[in-house]
Amino acid sequence: MTDNRVRPAWSEQFSSDAIKELFAQGPMAELTREWAWGGSTGQGVRVAIVDSGVDQDHPALGGRVRGGVAIEFDEDSENYLRTIDEPNPVDLTGHGTACAGIIHSLAPDAELISVRVLGEGGRGAAIQFAGGLGWAVDNDIQVCNLSLSTSLEEYYAMFHRVADRAYFNNVMLISAVNNIPAPSYPSLYSSVISVAAHEGKDPFTYYYNPDPPVEFGAPGFDVKVAWSNGSTMLATGNSYAAPHIAGLVALISAKHPNLTPFQIKAILYACANNVKGS
């Protein structure tokens, strides 16, 4: 999350004078958006929103929320976590609902699953975050939106293990990079799609960046998002860029259900607005 008055870190890599023209090679140059997701609505794809929860009754979500869970810290449990079923999920801040609404706007028939790992004020432990990712991998999720992260290096290995498990189980993780100029996990792992904000408004306009630490740029400035109590607001941040890419991945996954995360990332590259041949 970010204050709307602050420019998110890494977004300057997607300013109009910084975007690099790139060229797809060989068969990659033949890939088109029509082939990738034309006619797809996300039908049959389950998208997890690992966040503050999701307001299932928000009109911007079109009734597509299909329950979820809360991952809570419990020092008396063997692994310090407790998983609570939430057939009627709620959102404790509005942030998760905002992300879910963006995904729904691109992939209206995808199923939205709430994985609540943040509490009041957007607070939560890294172990809850990792536990939520683990739950998604184990529960028939195809796409996972992560508009949150940690910059603490002590958790590098823990999140790397979960990200690898997602990769080898064909669960595509889409992660917003940090809003401040600091490394964040899991966005830095090569198995994850990392996303920052650009200033454009077209939800289908996105760019590929060949330089670390972020790969893709999607709309994330003054985005109209769903929020608490059925409301909407304008929001700015890398948090709101990631679900644009998650929505596209849901469209691709619905049309081509047997693709691996590696293949999906390659398709996104080939179809980016700054890649010739797309």
Where are the language model's segments positioned?
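Active-site core segment of subtilase-fold serine proteases
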Residues: D3-L106, A110
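Proline-centered loop/turn at the N-terminus of a beta-strand
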Residues: R46, E111, N170-M172, I193
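Divalent metal-coordination and catalytic microenvironments
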Residues: D51, C144, L248
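Active-site/binding-pocket entry motifs
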Residues: D55, I71-E72, S77, L118, ...
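Glycine-rich, phosphate-binding/catalytic loops in enzymes
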Residues: G63-G68, R161-A163, S191-V192, D211-P212
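Subtilisin-like peptidase catalytic core
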Residues: R82-S151, H256, A270-V275
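Substrate-binding/access-modulating region of protease and related hydrolase catalytic domains
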Residues: L118-S190, S231-A235, Y240-A241, N274-G277
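Extracellular S/T/G-rich loop segment that most often corresponds to the catalytic His/Ser-adjacent loop
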Residues: S184-A254, N258, F262
